[in-house]
């Protein structure tokens, strides 16, 4: 009887998907590279490279990180780089580098920076965003400057004082003249001999924007999920002195410090595996060699499909942005007029998520519209999303 139950259970496992085996409901990701949905789907060639790495034996991890870091730095035109467990880890480690420099005793104290001469980072108040917390994980204190609608170079310079270790900068690629630009922040950092730490998580396209941003900071963080690497990966790059400090405070530096009898740094939780490391360099090589005009044409065809089918429905207005793509997202916006349809964007989102399979989209324009990131959608999924929206508004 026990054997029969085991066989039956095995058959049920075989007949169901891997997520369903554990009671998890898979759905369609129409948001893009969002952390809440798992971030990315590495292309087959990236998966193959990762599988080969995991099945080809073991390596000395420091050597793996340094040699792959050489490839990353060479590709981006920077002095040094290494793979991290996401962009947030790179931001945190980069901040730790700005705080400790090459002082191994300070590395052993972080995140307790109360005894440090410098433990503050200036940060434009108008750049307030979800991930500014990552700059404080290593013990830095953010000093917010300027206003919600802008900040001048003079205001930033006036905020730089004896406790200032650096400038925390969120690079979205879209800051206007009312803000201190990344170039102006670089000039101030040089003038006052402080560090520029840049969160450039999604600034991976155009390619010249990718390399330019990588080269401007003392430490720059990128999210590797945006180039087709696993969700849990990132890149820390920039000036050798500070990237090396970040490296020594990473998980591998923690292990090395113990072997050398030094104070252990704080970065032990930021671990990567060898498959992830190879996934990043394989994805980076693919990203810099692929035909991006073809990639964008494919994504444009997906956006056009939404416009072609849905824009003729009364009360539905589809907007396909015409500005050149900056960053990872290729989005189409769909507005729903409650006066005509009897429902708005929030209700459409709710019904899409409650369907089978659930479809996850982004709210836009205070809920009156939805945003659909097409870069993670297959052609079949595009048709499914269009069909479901049509059914909801009909």
Residues covered by each model-derived region:
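Conserved C-terminal alpha-helix-loop-beta "cap" of PLP-dependent enzymes
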Residues: 18, 309-387, 391
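Generic N-terminal amphipathic, Lys/Arg-enriched alpha-helix
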Residues: 26-36, 45-55, 328-334
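N-terminal glycine-/serine-/threonine-rich phosphate-binding loop
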Residues: 56, 60-65
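Glycine-rich phosphate/diphosphate-binding loops and the adjacent beta-loop-alpha structural elements
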Residues: 286-293, 370, 375
């Amino acid at each position: 009887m026990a054997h029969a139950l085991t066989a039956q259970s095995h058959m049920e496992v075989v007949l169901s998907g891997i997520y369903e085996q554990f009671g998890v409901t898979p759905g369609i990701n129409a948001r893009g590279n969002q952390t809440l949905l798992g971030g990315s789907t590495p292309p087959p060639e990236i998966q193959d490279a990762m599988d080969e790495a995991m099945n080809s034996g073991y390596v000395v991890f420091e050597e793996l990180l340094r040699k792959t870091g050489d490839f990353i730095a060479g590709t981006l035109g920077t002095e040094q780089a290494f793979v991290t467990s996401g962009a947030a880890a790179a931001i945190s480690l980069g901040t730790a580098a700005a705080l400790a420099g090459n002082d191994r005793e300070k590395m052993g104290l972080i995140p307790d920076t109360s005894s440090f001469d410098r433990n503050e980072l200036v940060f434009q108040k108008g750049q307030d965003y979800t991930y500014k917390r990552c700059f404080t994980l290593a013990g830095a204190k953010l000093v917010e400057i300027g206003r919600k609608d802008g900040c001048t170079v003079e205001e930033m310079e006036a905020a730089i004082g004896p406790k200032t270790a650096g400038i925390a900068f969120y690079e979205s690629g879209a800051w206007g003249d009312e803000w201190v630009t990344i170039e102006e922040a670089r000039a101030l950092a040089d003038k006052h001999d402080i560090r520029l730490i840049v969160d450039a998580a999604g600034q991976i396209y155009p390619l010249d924007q990718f390399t330019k941003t990588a080269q401007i900071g003392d430490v720059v963080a990128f999210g590797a999920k945006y180039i087709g690497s696993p969700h849990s990966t990132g890149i820390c790059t920039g000036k050798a002195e500070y990237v090396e400090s970040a490296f020594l405070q990473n998980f591998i530096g923690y292990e090395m410090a113990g072997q050398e009898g030094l104070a252990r740094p704080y970065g032990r939780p930021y671990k990567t595996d060898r498959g992830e490391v190879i996934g990043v360099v394989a994805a980076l090589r693919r990203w810099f060699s692929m035909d991006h005009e073809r990639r964008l044409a494919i994504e444009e065809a997906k956006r056009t499909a939404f416009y072609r089918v849905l824009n003729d429905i009364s009360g539905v207005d589809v907007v396909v942005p015409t500005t050149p793509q900056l960053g990872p997202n290729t989005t189409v916006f769909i507005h729903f007029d409650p006066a005509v349809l009897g429902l708005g964007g929030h209700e459409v989102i709710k019904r899409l998520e409650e369907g089978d399979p659930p479809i996850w989209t982004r709210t836009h324009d205070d809920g009156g519209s939805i945003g659909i990131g097409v870069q993670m959608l297959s052609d079949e999924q595009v048709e499914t999303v269009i069909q479901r929206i049509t059914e909801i508004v009909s």
